[in-house]
Regions:
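Short hydrophobic/aromatic patch on the recognition helix
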Residues: 47, 96-97, 101
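Residue-level detector of short coil/turn "hinge" positions at structural boundaries
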Residues: 44, 82, 93, 108-109
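…primarily DNA-binding HTH/wHTH and HhH modules…
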Residues: 99-119
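Terminal helix-turn-helix DNA-binding modules in bacterial transcription factors
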Residues: 54-95, 114-119
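Basic, amphipathic alpha-helical hairpins
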Residues: 1-5, 19-32, 50-51, 55, ...
Length: 119
């Protein structure tokens, strides 16, 4: 039986796959949707449209989730100070990265790291 929900076309799916490849390669340096849209030779509006159609959420949400994953990876698997992690991930400063992480996860960087070391 065919799904009543329209399926994304092949081009849209390929764009999303290419977006994920770029994101994996460049997320530490680039958190702006425009960078990825430019790299894919499409507009930011079109990237938003394709991501919403294929993934159900925006490219910015996916970028944010990838950055949170990277931060968690550093906090869990290294002893690097927060300031150094912020530098590695190209945040303007550590306090901005702290606010960014808390806004997206509801947990402070220190609390997250402490929780991981207890596990």
């Amino acid at each position: 039986e065919l799904s009543s929900k329209p399926q994304p076309d092949t081009r849209s799916r390929k764009l999303v796959v290419d977006f994920y490849k770029l994101l994996a390669r460049h997320c530490r340096q680039h958190r702006d949707v425009a960078f990825y849209a430019d790299a894919l030779c499409i507009t930011t509006t079109y990237l938003y449209k394709v991501c919403r159609k294929v993934l159900g959420f925006s490219p910015k949400e996916e970028i944010d989730q990838q950055i949170v994953f990277e931060i968690k990876n550093y906090l869990t698997n290294t002893d690097l100070p927060i300031k150094r992690i912020a530098e590695e991930l190209h945040f303007e400063d550590a306090s901005y990265m702290c606010r960014y992480f808390r806004r997206l996860t509801g947990v402070s960087l220190a609390d997250y790291r402490n929780e991981q070391t207890r596990l």
